[in-house]
């Protein structure tokens, strides 16, 4: 509404959806419309997973699933929308963009960026070559709600687990 020019952007979890769509070239009104259109698909609960959960609890007394939703709906939505803007890989995005996630096994922050990043002091891992759908799926993989996202040999979860607001990373773009 105020026509503020945005030079770079970052987002974690659902913020990664907004940041990615904006960086790919969608206007705020378009992003609002996309959320309204696809919200139910994103929130979809896989009833097979609920059955597995109940079956596992009854037979073993243990939780045998890693999420109520696989996260594939986010992956497909982001790929669909970004592919319409000729964005397939995070490196295809021209606007500086940072999307954090967390390695579930090591606890390391994995930051996906659209451009090379300057030196950084902590153990954050920077990746600027990844499928755009995987990037956002990983950042949105909130434990127990969404299954962890497989990326290379790692399992990634919601960036908010360690890096809720990626201001430091954006600062280094």
Where are these regions (language model features)?
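Patatin-like phospholipase
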Residues: 1-12, 20-173
């Amino acid at each position: 509404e105020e026509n503020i020019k945005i030079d770079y952007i970052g987002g974690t979890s659902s913020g990664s959806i907004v940041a990615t769509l904006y960086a790919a070239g969608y206007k705020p009104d378009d992003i609002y419309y996309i959320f309204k259109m696809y919200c139910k698909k994103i929130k979809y609960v896989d009833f097979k997973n609920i059955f597995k959960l109940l079956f596992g609890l009854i037979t073993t007394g243990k939780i045998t699933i890693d999420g109520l939703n696989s996260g594939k709906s986010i992956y497909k939505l982001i790929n669909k929308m970004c592919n319409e803007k000729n964005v397939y890989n995070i490196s295809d995005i021209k606007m500086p963009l940072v999307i954090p996630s967390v390695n579930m096994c090591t606890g390391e922050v994995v930051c996906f960026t659209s451009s090379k990043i300057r030196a950084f002091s902590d153990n954050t891992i920077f990746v600027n070559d990844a499928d755009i759908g995987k990037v956002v799926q990983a950042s949105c993989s909130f434990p127990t709600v969404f299954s962890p996202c497989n990326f290379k040999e790692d399992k990634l979860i919601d960036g908010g687990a360690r890096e809720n607001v990626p201001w430091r990373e954006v600062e280094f773009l």
